[in-house]
């Protein structure tokens, strides 16, 4: 009976014929995040120094005079401009990515994961190319916004993550899914840690241009890997139209269409939980470099590199902790522990005035990144196998909305609180993290095994 149905579909599975080898998705995510993390803090520092030069602020990182410039209005103007242009880049990326990532993610449920991975890789490549031109030719910083928009148009990093997590869901069982999600996120963290260590030292030695050129080269390699080496995980990819409202409708139906195999309440509340977690994560990340550059810390590029590496270390420590804690605790309670440490780290950041205290805050985040793989796995188990792309494109949309919200709140709040408490945004982040802590605990207590109903083989 199945034999008569399969032959018509096999000729449509054309992408497999073009593959040189069936590689996993993790190298793609590793290369993408290495390039992005290499560019991120450097872009912030580049904006800082460009605005400093434009406004005639000498802004050196000399330790002796740093604390005496805390009330310098020119320095505060540099901080404000840097923060605002970071916001403009994120808003531009969100407005375009809101449409493209949801469209492309649901489209991947039909055509396969590789087309989205290739498009998203090309977008990241274009963004890096624009950044190289800005740095090399001293173009207006507004071109950073243009590069961000071009990247978002082709799916952005969120689209690449949507396809990557969907491909993991395609090939993993419900028993192993949480750990596989954490493993994918760990590859993000290792890449970020290495890029952070390299970026700070390289900037001090050779300036801004060479790190951006390396990011461009890595993204070229990533695009080639996505096109010719990634092993398609969708069983029967088939041709379908890209520009149709059916793709967006499939995402809406995840949350509004009643079905016996899923709980719309759980989908909505877990989506809210991951929205808040990502908002705090990216909001803090957006202002951390600026917080460290300015008084009283006055970090140089080397220390910023160490700090950014410490920020990515929890991807590894969280992976190991998740594997160990799963032997004695349910996933939800592991996430609760991670949230508790995340809150502690944010509170320490808020009151950090010396370098050792900042690194203490980073140390407290060692379990903070068990949260998102747990929530992603729970969401994945609530939908059918044929809805994984739509689900993770919805999560990518939530991710984009969270990043915009983070930029709007943290990048606007940070300059507004410079005069009375620079660390206030971190306290706000700690308070916001109480929301997912309550939601996850409430859902686990109310119906702890609901997510396994699609996967009876799991305990």
UniProtKB/Swiss-Prot annotation:
The modification Phosphoserine is found at residues 6, 458. Pfam families: MFS_1. It catalyses: folate(in) + H(+)(in) = folate(out) + H(+)(out); (6S)-5-methyl-5,6,7,8-tetrahydrofolate(in) + H(+)(in) = (6S)-5-methyl-5,6,7,8-tetrahydrofolate(out) + H(+)(out); methotrexate(in) + H(+)(in) = methotrexate(out) + H(+)(out); pemetrexed(in) + H(+)(in) = pemetrexed(out) + H(+)(out). Changing residue 189 to V: In HFM; decreased folate uptake. Expressed at highest level in the upper half of the small intestine (duodenum and jejunum), expression decreases downwardly in the subsequent quarter and is undetectable in the last quarter (the lowest ileum). Also expressed in kidney, liver, placenta, spleen, retina and retinal pigment epithelium. Lower levels found in testis. Very low levels in brain, lung, stomach, heart and muscle. Pemetrexed binds at residues 90, 185, 315. Disulfide bonds join 66-298. Changing residue 392 to E/D/K/L/I/Q/T: Abolished methotrexate uptake. Optimum pH is 4.0-5.5. Activity decreases above pH 5.5 and reaches negligible levels at neutral pH and above. Inhibited by myricetin. Keywords: Acetylation, Cell membrane, Cytoplasm, Disease variant, Disulfide bond, Endosome, Folate-binding, Glycoprotein, Membrane, Phosphoprotein, Symport, Transmembrane, Transmembrane helix, Transport. One of its GO terms (cellular component) is brush border membrane. The modification N-acetylmethionine is found at residue 1. Its main location: membrane. It is found in: Cell membrane; Apical cell membrane; Basolateral cell membrane; Endosome membrane. Changing residue 156 to E: Does not affect methotrexate uptake. InterPro entries: MFS, MFS_dom, MFS_trans_sf, Sugar_transporter_CS. It is linked to Hereditary folate malabsorption: Rare autosomal recessive disorder characterized by impaired intestinal folate absorption with folate deficiency resulting in anemia, hypoimmunoglobulinemia with recurrent infections, and recurrent or chronic diarrhea. In many patients, neurological abnormalities such as seizures or intellectual disability become apparent during early childhood, attributed to impaired transport of folates into the central nervous system. When diagnosed early, the disorder can be treated by administration of folate. Constitutes an important route for the delivery of antifolate drugs, such as methotrexate and pemetrexed, in cancer chemotherapy. Ubiquitously expressed in solid tumors to which it delivers antifolates: within the acid microenvironment of cancer cells, antifolate drugs uptake mediated by SLC46A1/PCFT is increased. Belongs to the major facilitator superfamily. SLC46A family. This is Proton-coupled folate transporter. It comes from Homo sapiens (Human).
